[in-house]
Every structure is written in C-alpha cells, then in structure tokens.
Amino acid sequence: MGAGSSKPEASAGSKHIFESNSPIQFSSNLVDGLQSNTETDSARAKSLELEIQNRVAKELERLRAREQQTLAEIEKRLSEAKDTGSFASAPSAPAVTHYPAGSLDLDAPRIPFAGREYAPPPPAAVEVAAVNKELNRESVNSEIEELRVKLEGRKKLAELDEGVAKAQKDVVSCLRLNDRRPLDCWKEVAEFKKEVARLEEGFVDRIVG
C-alpha cells in the first residue's frame, strides 16, 4: 500500500517535456546549403511554368515553320504546273524554210496533172495533235485542282487546333493553382503532349496523302 501511494498518478492528457542539456548542432554543409538556396517553392513553380510555356511555344513555332515550308513547296508546284500547261497549250509556229531564188522547193504544193484531182493530205496528224493537246490540258488542270484542294487543307493549320489550345490552357491553369506542387499537373501535361502529337500526326498524314 505504501508503494502504491508513493507514485503520483498521471492525469489524463498530461504531457511530458524532455529537455536536453546539450545544444542541438547541424553540420556546416547543411547550414551552408540552406543559406545558399534562396529559391522558394513558389519561385520553383513559376520557373517550371515558364519552362513549360517556352517548350509549348517552341513546339507550336516548329509546326508553323513546317507548315509554311509545305505551303511554299505546294505553291511552287502549282506555278510550275501552270507554266507547263501554258507551254503545252500554246500553238507551235510552223517551220518556215527559205530557199534561194530560182531553186526547186520539193516541199512546195504539187500542181496536179490534167485529168487528176488534187487530194489533200489526210487529217490524221492534225487530229492526233489536237487529242494530245486536249489530254495535256486535262491532266494539268486535274493536277492543279488536286494541289488546290491540298493547299486549302494546309491553310487550316494556320489556326491553332482547339484541342491543343484547350490542353495548353489547362496546363497553365493547373500550374497557377498548384504553384507549390507542380508535379500534380502531370495529367494536364500528358494531355497536352498527346494533343500536340495528334496534331503533328495529322499534319504528316496530310502531306503524305
């Protein structure tokens, strides 16, 4: 009974505080590292946001440059096709041969003998030339029309795709809301990369197709 009464009973919710007689010390490397690192979580989040925006801008600039190059090549092909069509449709001037005065021209029209009618040359050569001329014109017009349709498809890429614009906006908004936890925006970043890859794949398909 005496032993039980000698220990004070701890009341519910009581706290024990232990104090150390020796001072707490940190290594010099840790102290130097903490003093030299002045960047806060907010500053790191802003740096990450700027880096992502720069990468997005570079990717869009690369797509626009590639599109401009393709448009220039198509316009060049259209110009060459038009020049070829004009050259093919232009009538060729007949060759004129000059002979000295008093010489005999074997290519001159023959004077029919008496009692024989003069038969003109068959128009087969003229018809073949006309058919070839028409075929060349149709093929050139068909190629020009095909290139024009492709060119109109390329011009649509000048405007930013809605999916890419939305994904970019979501990434920026997420980084602003989670400035101290930028890694929480991995879903938005992955979706943006997916939209950019889809846009680039469609661009390549339009060029190859």
Curated annotation (Swiss-Prot):
Coiled-coil segments on the chain, per record: 48-86, 127-156
S-S pairs: none
Cellular localisation: Mitochondrion inner membrane
GO biological process, one term: cellular response to osmotic stress
Record has Mitochondrion as a keyword: yes
The protein's assembly and partners: Component of the mitochondrial contact site and cristae organizing system (MICOS) complex.
Protein name as it appears in the record: MICOS complex subunit mic19
Organism: Emericella nidulans (strain FGSC A4 / ATCC 38163 / CBS 112.46 / NRRL 194 / M139)
